[in-house]
Amino acid sequence: MGCGLRKLEDPDDSSPGKIFSTLKRPQVETKTEFAYEYVLLDFTLQASSNPEVIKINSILDIVTKVENYYLKGYIVGAIHPVIQPVGQRKHLPASYLYRVVLLRLKLSPKNSAAPSGQRRPRLVIEECPLTSEAQTNDAAKELIEKINVAAKRGMKFVGFISQHYSPSKFCNGTNHDGDIESMLHVRHGSDENCRSWNEGTLSGQSSESGIEEELHHESGQYQMEQNGSPTSSKSRKGEASDNKLYTVFNAFDDDSTSWAYQEGILSMKVTRKGSVISTLDADWLELTTFYYKQGLSLIDSFVFWETSKGEHLPKSLEGFFIYEEEGSGVPGSSRKGNDAIVVEQWTVIEGCEIKTDYGPLLHTLAEFGWLLTSVLPTPVLRHDSEGNLATKQIVFLQRPVMWNSAAQTPDKKASRHIKGEDKNKATSRSIGLDTTSSQPAESRHLPEECRLSPSRECWTKEGRLAQHNSFSGFSSSDNVLRELDDGQFDQEDGVTQVTCM
């Protein structure tokens, strides 16, 4: 499952993401009894000039901000930071951005009545104390126990979300709260900063390398002065209390329906530049298909990103997926298994505004009954030619099995079918700057058969697709899947599907 590594100088190395699925394309595009409607809301803990990014003072404020959506039948399906705030990434402006995905059932013409017994929940966010020293396997079991206890009271688990408290209040402006902040903040539109952050690109290195080197150098210098120890990913003395972990639930007034949660293996290979993670790799379907076949839903993930001061930097990261056993009254819960789609998506951020993300694909797949259940943000970063930040996110979607598609086994590898001269070119499954190209994803043209992600400004808050002259986008979200070459999904039964975006 996956592809080999392309050469650094490959001009066609432009994929902004990849899709992995247990189904072939015609099956992915088959409409089901139910479809979904999604609303994507962005929140920030800092001031933002963009009125569409909602300012909050705490994660807890999200509850009141989404109340009106709950009255309209939406619920929070996923919540995540835009980037994984690990180490010095906690000081980047984008680390204060959060995404909330709301969803509701959209009835198809086949079924014009709402499912019976459907209840309206309320959003609950509770603090879940967890220090960095407590991030062990024992702590993982403790977290699972906590959400299982809550589930017995009618609390349906949505996910964990952390908040790093910082004195900084500025998005892309001048920071007055310390040298480390001012060194790491980048002013949007500054040619000088864009040049400095893209020196790696101009010198033949990836723009991601430039980020890692700058973060590594600046944060290392600062920590050497403060701690006498360079680039420790552990928080400085006294900072542990500045990180809070929250648990998010959809709470029902009665406990007639309960859910059970269990953990599953999550292991990723990583490469680093210094102590900073630059790429990571995982066999997503191999890790998850077994659980999907059992009818479980992947709800969230928990990764031990940090390493303590003085510890050996591992070449792999461990964590766990959290799976849910569906309770009664859940549409499709009577089915014996789930099919899955996993998307490796580059999300582009301009200042405190998300410019390119998984939104268009999500809205397209929603029409075919695909439910987004979890988004795993990563600390893997790069910059585009305009100086905008890009981060890799892993998006998990599922749908109840409609046929014997779950007969696939998680140990089977997926193959990739490509036409033309790209047929013999391999692409990396690495989640970092796997293409290691010197050009940003949104400024290069994709091969016809690899188009899945629209332009950098393709999805507006009104749900419209727009074009951008530096990227091959799409005229409408309905065309996203149709742009895929049929050959990419034309594989023998029982093999997981892979395509590039």
UniProtKB/Swiss-Prot annotation:
Q: Where is the lipid attached (S-palmitoyl cysteine)?
A: 3
Superkingdom of the source species: Eukaryota
Supply one GO BP term.
response to exogenous dsRNA
- A GO cellular component annotation in the UniProt record: plasma membrane
Per UniProt, the ranges with Basic and acidic residues bias are: 410-425
Q: Where is the composition biased (Polar residues)?
A: 220-233, 427-441
Task: Give the way it sits in the membrane.
Answer: Lipid-anchor
Query: Main localisation, per the record?
Result: membrane
**Sorted alphabetically, which keywords does the UniProt record give?**
Cell membrane, Lipoprotein, Membrane, Myristate, Palmitate, Phosphoprotein
Q: Which residues carry this modification: Phosphoserine?
A: 405, 430
InterPro entries recorded: Raftlin
- Residues anchoring lipid (N-myristoyl glycine): 2
Q: Where is this region: Disordered?
A: 1-20, 196-239, 407-449
Q: Where in the cell is it found?
A: Cell membrane
**Sites of Phosphothreonine modification:** 409
Q: What does this protein do?
A: Upon bacterial lipopolysaccharide stimulation, mediates clathrin-dependent internalization of TLR4 in dendritic cells, resulting in activation of TICAM1-mediated signaling and subsequent IFNB1 production. May regulate B-cell antigen receptor-mediated signaling.
The UniProt entry's sequence similarity note says: Belongs to the raftlin family.
Protein name stated in the entry = Raftlin-2
Organism this protein belongs to: Homo sapiens
Taxon lineage: Eukaryota, Metazoa, Chordata, Craniata, Vertebrata
- The gene is RFTN2
